[in-house]
Structure formats: C-alpha cells, structure tokens
C-alpha cells in the first residue's frame, strides 16, 4: 500500500508536466507500474491514485447500484473525469488540460500527499482551503482522533 505524505510547491510547464516529488515517488508501489489515474477531487483539486490503489476503488465502484440516481451521478462524474497518466523518464506526470482548468492550476502547483493518493492544488486555493475553517487544527484533531 502507498502512504503519501508531505506538501511541496513545484512549477508546472505549459504542457501540464510536473515533477512527482522524490519523497512521494518512493511511496509508489511497484504494483502501480508508474501509472496513475487522475480525476476530479471533491474539493477544487486534482487527485491522482497509483494504479494499484485505483483498482481497490474500481471494486467499490462496481458494487454501486447503477439504478440509484446518486450512485449513477457519482459514477458518471468520477469516471468521465478519469484519465490514465504515466510517470515519464524525468519523473513527471502530465496533467490533462481539463483537470488543470477545473483546479485553476497554471505556473505553480501545490502537491499534497493524502495516504493512498496525491492531490494537485492551485497554491492560492490550497491556502484559502486551509484558512477557511472556523475550527482550529487542534480542535479538529481532538474531534477526529479522539473518537
């Protein structure tokens, strides 16, 4: 299993290519074959799952009821936005234009490790997200981890 953590801000070129941080590359399982599935995040970001991690989600997707309106909507959205990308010889991934436009990413990108996947954010949006909570980190940590 992958375990991505940390945060880096990198440049992204006009072709959508960005380096995968070295510390995150080390967490990619050999089972992923240097392949990610990128899709739209639930916040205004792009998420990238190593192929082996994505396979576990595919099993969950297959178990959803395609006759249920919410299940069907979710499946259409996540699968329509899903693209396969590979880590190239220079340790970069190319993020599709539609994803970059959705997340408002150009020039710089903040890359965040999120256990089984990596998130790509517009740096300003990420800062807004972090600052947009009414509760402090300590309060949220006590609620989440104190269960």
Each predicted region: which residue ranges?
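Flexible "stalk/tail and boundary" regions
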Residues: 1-9, 14-17, 23-85, 89-90, ...
């Amino acid at each position: 299993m992958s375990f991505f953590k940390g945060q880096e801000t990198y440049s992204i070129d006009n072709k959508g290519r960005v380096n995968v941080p070295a510390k995150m590359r080390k967490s990619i399982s050999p089972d992923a074959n240097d392949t990610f599935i990128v899709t739209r995040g639930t916040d205004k970001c792009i998420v990238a799952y190593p192929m082996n991690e994505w396979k576990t989600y595919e099993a969950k997707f297959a178990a959803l009821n395609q006759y249920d309106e919410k299940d069907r909507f979710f499946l259409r959205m996540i699968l329509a936005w899903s693209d396969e990308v590979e880590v190239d010889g220079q340790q970069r991934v190319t993020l599709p234009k539609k994803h970059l436009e959705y997340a408002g990413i150009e020039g710089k990108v903040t890359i965040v490790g999120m256990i089984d996947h990596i998130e790509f954010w517009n740096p300003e949006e990420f800062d807004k997200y972090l600052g947009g909570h009414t509760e402090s980190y300590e309060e949220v940590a006590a609620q989440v981890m104190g269960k």
